[in-house]
Amino acid sequence: MNKTEFIAFMTDHGHNHKHASHKTLTKAEAEKALNLVLDSVISAIKSHHNINITGFGSFEIHHRKAREGRNPKTGAKMKIDAYNQPTFRAGRKMKEACN
């Protein structure tokens, strides 16, 4: 599901919600809310802050050291620079919902 499909899913009045008090959003409201959350996560990770949302999961940044690798086509050695890798680890509720 891409971002546009997810926004449509968020605004779908026909799918069943667990809570009767769930207020549906317009597409514009859903897009604005999603963009705000995504921009905030990116900004926090960029500032080297970990984000833990109980039950949902955690966003973290892992530093990868520089290392030597190989070009898979030629087999030639090459240097891979150090970089920061953003990661997501699913929380218990997320894992349980998938199984």
UniProtKB/Swiss-Prot annotation:
Q: Which domain of life is it from?
A: Bacteria
Query: One Pfam match, by short name?
Result: Bac_DNA_binding
User: Which range is the signal sequence, renumbered to this chain?
Assistant: none
Is DNA-binding there in the keyword field?
yes
Specify where the region named Disordered lies, as residue ranges.
Answer: 67-86
Which SMART domains does the protein's record reference?
BHL
* Keyword match Chaperone: no
In terms of InterPro entries, this protein maps to:
Hist_DNA-bd, Histone-like_DNA-bd_CS, IHF-like_DNA-bd_dom_sf
Tell me the Gene Ontology biological-process terms attached to this UniProt entry. chromosome condensation
Q: Which UniProt keywords apply?
A: DNA condensation, DNA-binding
Named from the GO MF annotations, one term is: structural constituent of chromatin
Write out the function statement from the record: Histone-like DNA-binding protein which is capable of wrapping DNA to stabilize it, and thus to prevent its denaturation under extreme environmental conditions.
Similarity annotation: Belongs to the bacterial histone-like protein family.
Assembly and partners? Homodimer.
Designated name of the protein: DNA-binding protein HU
From which source organism is this entry?
Answer: Rickettsia conorii (strain ATCC VR-613 / Malish 7)
User: Which gene is annotated as encoding this protein in its UniProt record?
Assistant: hup
